[in-house]
């Protein structure tokens, strides 16, 4: 429910190359609230793979619905409170993700601590896009580490293993998206893994008040 202290704002997005839209938004009183990058690594031949943190191991995730829901819930938990602007964690969105034709849990890299998911990368290959643009690109769709397992090098370990997984699937480049202001240092992690900024986009906000 809205309260007297709830911040309210109009919001929209624009890619960096849309200069006309940027000028229009500025004239309308919008300000850039956040920067988002798509990052690319163009060579998967040589990947520095660090050791896994002690007590953790990489194991497959089941294709069955309960296993996929366990992974979904772990991902949602990891991003809750850290994901700027919110995200759709609804059951309907989970069901849509399961129905995606490019959904392939065999590409995922999941770190386990016993029966608990400590972190993971949901990798994907967009087959139709690759065919249309004659490329072999894989995506690190989501990268997450749950709070009890952070600051141990797990993020670097699963990102590197994801690059290897995509290479083994026949890809020669990898992409991911990142919030430049991610509070857990995701941008630096990806830069150290060999990613460079490929495209930029802006999140715009313009505050407004509601008459009460």
Sequence positions of predicted segments:
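Conserved active-site tyrosine of GNAT-family acetyltransferases
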Residues: 21, 25, 190, 195
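Acyl-donor-binding surface of acyltransferase catalytic domains
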Residues: 1-62, 202-206
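Conserved hydrophobic beta-strand within the GNAT/NAT acetyltransferase core sheet
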Residues: 10-12, 140, 174-178
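Short amphipathic alpha-helix that is part of the acyltransferase structural core
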Residues: 50-89
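Short glycine/proline-centered loop/turn elements that form peptide/ligand docking sites
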Residues: 159, 182-186, 203-208
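Conserved acetyl-CoA-binding loop-helix of GNAT-fold acetyltransferases
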Residues: 1, 141-145, 151-168, 173, ...
């Amino acid at each position: 429910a809205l309260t007297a202290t709830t911040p309210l704002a109009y919001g929209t997005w624009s890619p960096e190359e849309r200069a006309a839209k940027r000028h229009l938004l500025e004239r309308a009183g919008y300000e850039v609230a956040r920067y988002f990058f798509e990052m690319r690594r163009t060579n998967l031949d040589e990947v520095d793979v660090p050791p896994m943190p002690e007590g953790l191991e990489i194991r497959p995730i089941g294709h069955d619905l309960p296993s996929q829901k366990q992974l979904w819930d772990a991902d949602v938990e990891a991003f809750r409170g850290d994901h700027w602007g919110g995200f759709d964690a609804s059951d309907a969105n989970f069901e849509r993700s399961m129905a995606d034709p490019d959904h392939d849990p065999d590409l995922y890299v999941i770190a386990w601590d016993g029966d608990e998911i400590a972190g993971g990368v949901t990798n994907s290959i967009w087959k139709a896009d690759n065919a249309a643009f004659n490329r072999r690109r894989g995506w690190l769709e989501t990268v997450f580490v749950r709070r009890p397992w952070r600051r141990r090098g797990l993020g670097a370990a699963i990102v590197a293993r994801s690059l290897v997984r995509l290479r083994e699937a026949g890809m020669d480049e990898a992409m991911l998206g990142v919030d430049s202001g991610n509070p857990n240092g995701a941008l630096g992690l990806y830069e150290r893994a060999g990613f460079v900024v490929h495209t930029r986009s802006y999140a715009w906000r313009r505050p407004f008040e509601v008459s009460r």
